[in-house]
Amino acid sequence: MADLSFIEDTVAFPEKEEDEEEEEEGVEWGYEEGVEWGLVFPDANGEYQSPINLNSREARYDPSLLDVRLSPNYVVCRDCEVTNDGHTIQVILKSKSVLSGGPLPQGHEFELYEVRFHWGRENQRGSEHTVNFKAFPMELHLIHWNSTLFGSIDEAVGKPHGIAIIALFVQIGKEHVGLKAVTEILQDIQYKGKSKTIPCFNPNTLLPDPLLRDYWVYEGSLTIPPCSEGVTWILFRYPLTISQLQIEEFRRLRTHVKGAELVEGCDGILGDNFRPTQPLSDRVIRAAFQ
């Protein structure tokens, strides 16, 4: 199987024509039409798509991942905007937090742009990735872009070494104190298009392991349209814990604007916002632990 780790001679992803970009912009999409995304977003038909199922027995231990320690230099964000976009909850980070080391190109910094959440209507499902075909109730994505090579996240999307995403599985248990700043205001942004500024958010509270050694790595894509490839995925082995009350706050959110007339058969509840797992193809999943 081919090792798709960062290499110097990676083939560049083809640039989109201007009319193709215009066609994709503003297109409505939903998770009920997930299998049809490729009709409008051609990248969704790519060979190296995300999410995937992680088979822990087939993951290849790669000690080189520990040669340069994975190093998140995150700072507390002041006045962060939390938004319900009808597909997920986004926490937009304004402070400059960066990620480097580990599987990322040496000397490159990846700036943390946002945190996104994916969850199920029930605790038996919700995560985008699965581990040995087991799903978690929720998955968090810390989305970074390569600020060494590019001037913005828009420039970085779809480019080799452009995007790095830390994925964190979430299980039900004790309350997560670091996420209280978000869960406490979700009732104020129940409907699509609503947003609220929170005074303080610390992304460091989302990192489960101080040593940051137990993670898997593979090359994939964005899990939402346009599903562009060129994404390095870093998935931590040990999940975060949130309380049942906290996840229920997410399950009260809506996919529509307030007062909108719902189509028949749609209850408007925001949940099950995960893409089905995609074929691994010839990709190798690397592990930083044995």
From Swiss-Prot:
Residues 27-289 form the Alpha-carbonic anhydrase domain. GO terms for molecular function: carbonate dehydratase activity; zinc ion binding. The active site is at residue 87. The keyword Cell inner membrane does not apply. Pfam families: Carb_anhydrase (PF00194). The keyword Hydrolase does not apply. Residues 1-26 are annotated as: Disordered. The record marks 116 as: Ancestral zinc ligand. CDD domains: alpha_CARP_VIII (cd03120). One of its GO terms (cellular component) is cytoplasm. Residues 16-26 have a biased composition (Acidic residues). SMART domains: Carb_anhydrase. GO terms for biological process: positive regulation of calcium-mediated signaling. InterPro entries: CA_dom (IPR001148), CA_dom_sf (IPR036398), Carbonic_anhydrase_a-class (IPR023561), Carbonic_anhydrase_a-class_CS (IPR018338), CARP_VIII (IPR041877). Zn(2+) binds at residues 118, 141. The modification Phosphoserine is found at residue 5. It is linked to Spinocerebellar ataxia, autosomal recessive, 34: A form of spinocerebellar ataxia, a clinically and genetically heterogeneous group of cerebellar disorders due to degeneration of the cerebellum with variable involvement of the brainstem and spinal cord. SCAR34 is characterized by congenital cerebellar ataxia associated with dysarthia, quadrupedal gait and intellectual disability. Does not have a carbonic anhydrase catalytic activity. Belongs to the alpha-carbonic anhydrase family. This is Carbonic anhydrase-related protein. The lineage of its organism: Eukaryota, Metazoa, Chordata, Craniata, Vertebrata.
